[in-house]
Amino acid sequence: MAQSKEQRVHDVFQSIYKKYDVMNSVISLQQHKSWRKDTMKQMDVQAGTSALDVCCGTGDWTLALSEAVGEQGSVIGLDFSENMLAVGREKVAAAKRTNISLVHGNAMALPYDDNTFDYVTIGFGLRNVPDYMQVLQEMCRVAKPGGKIVCLETSQPTIPVFKQLYFFYFKRIMPLAGKVFAKKYEEYSWLQESTLAFPGKDKLRDMFVEAGMKDVTVKSYTGGVCAMHMGIKPI
């Protein structure tokens, strides 16, 4: 019997957690940190606020949000892979952050009340969920009116030659890099599949609007291989 997307993704991340951070740097050619840093700048996170980081993985964005909201603020990182969360807990402990809670949960059914968070983020996780729209609607639901919902995700370049190189890299090079650096060829084959199947930036902008957000901002990075989408929950 074929695995569901949800089960396959869960198995992938339960397997690659030890090398996930290293492979992020390898696959993005060290760019993912600068993409996230600029996204945080665009978000203009205020001290004393609350944030939910959906599909938080090993917690890099969760930690960045924690620093931005400060001691008077609070951040929850949610992920469905216990192994990824275990790495995240080690990072939180090492950073001595007391305003972070890491929670095992499902992005498709967020265990929080409506209108709870000032910021709701998802970084390199939306492409892996079974239903993009359901997750976007859930993120919008738990955001406060006027709150920001932000997705940082791989995208698809539109420049012809660059687009061809991009597809070659993800189809051929990325799985091989996974085999060399993480000994996980099949798992990184899945990640390239999910990347190439993910909607382009214009389609994702439309999905943000359909999910209930307004004033959607889109910013592309590194020739369009990554994009930030930020929407506001109507007041």
Swiss-Prot record:
GO terms for molecular function: demethylmenaquinone methyltransferase activity. It comes from the Bacteria. One of its GO terms (biological process) is menaquinone biosynthetic process. Keywords: Menaquinone biosynthesis, Methyltransferase, S-adenosyl-L-methionine, Transferase. Its EC number is 2.1.1.163. The keyword Transferase applies. S-adenosyl-L-methionine binds at T58, D79, N106, A107. Pfam families: Ubie_methyltran. Pathway: Quinol/quinone metabolism; menaquinone biosynthesis; menaquinol from 1,4-dihydroxy-2-naphthoate: step 2/2. Methyltransferase required for the conversion of demethylmenaquinol (DMKH2) to menaquinol (MKH2). This is Demethylmenaquinone methyltransferase.
